Amino acid sequence: MLEVEGVTIHLISEGKGPLVLFVHGSQAWSYAWRYQIKPFAEAMYRVVALDLPGNGYSAAPSYHGYSVVGNSRLIGQVLDGLQAQQVILVASSAGGLPVLDFTIRHPERVCALILSSACGMPHSLPGLWNLIRLTLVGEASRLFLSPSLIRKNLVEAFADPRKVTREDVEAYLRPLLRPGSWGANLRTERSTDPTFVEQNLNSIRCPVLIVWGKEDAWHPVAMSETFHQQLPQAEVEIFSNCGHLPHEEQPACFNQSALKFLEGKVK
């Protein structure tokens, strides 16, 4: 645990070396990086996977700014708390927005970026995310949180539904049922404004790896090319037979690509 301006942040930490900070997406937590923590630590990196406020097992205070800028600021505060001046940032899905925002505002602190089907370019939202942004509808949807709903969402996110396990369903559902968690998730969804990131993305100069699933049903694979147009220095890896969560659905391929990308860039 790490205290950041009165907010208790849950972290998973392992290894020694250059810091790699993993940031999860919507309605997720550090469990999303379960397949990356040990391989990156064994490759001589200091691995930290955080739970953003209101997610996983971090606190969900009403005074936290559940916006892109608020979570971007929190990333900087976490780095300060870890006494780290520089970092390699790894982001999945909606976690891309605060990570990119932080990189744009503090380029001197970011050695490299790894984006796994990340937000940061204009795109349409899946139906569920549009619904929960509606007043009252989002609050009422808390009543329907169940293993079957979580399984449905994960199956949509994977190209191969057989890879969705009961353990995964339970792991993603459990934190959402904690007091304050669903309300914090709603505030995050409703406060998300990608404008600053979209307008300033091409200012990023650090090395970037873009990883995408060819069968991503939520962020079409064409988004990876749009990202590449804004970040011409980026390396792009497209995984076949893979959906929205490459680091979870094809972790061995993801880890191999990411660790190879980092060779010689930060050590």
Report residues per predicted region.
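Short alpha-helix in the alpha/beta-hydrolase fold that links the catalytic acid
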Residues: D168, C206, P220-Q229
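Short beta-strand/loop motif that positions the catalytic acidic residue
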Residues: I204, I210-W212
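Conserved HGGG/HGGXW glycine-rich cap/lid loop of the alpha/beta-hydrolase fold
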Residues: V7-Y57
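Acidic catalytic loop of the alpha/beta-hydrolase fold
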Residues: E215-H219
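Catalytic active-site module of serine/aspartate enzymes centered on a nucleophile-bearing elbow/loop
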Residues: A234-K267
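Active-site loop/oxyanion-hole signature of alpha/beta-hydrolase fold enzymes
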Residues: I12, A49-V90, A94, Q256
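Conserved alpha/beta-hydrolase catalytic His-Asp/Glu region
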Residues: I9, S124-L125, L143-S203
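Flexible "cap/lid" loop of the alpha/beta hydrolase fold
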Residues: I104, C111-S141
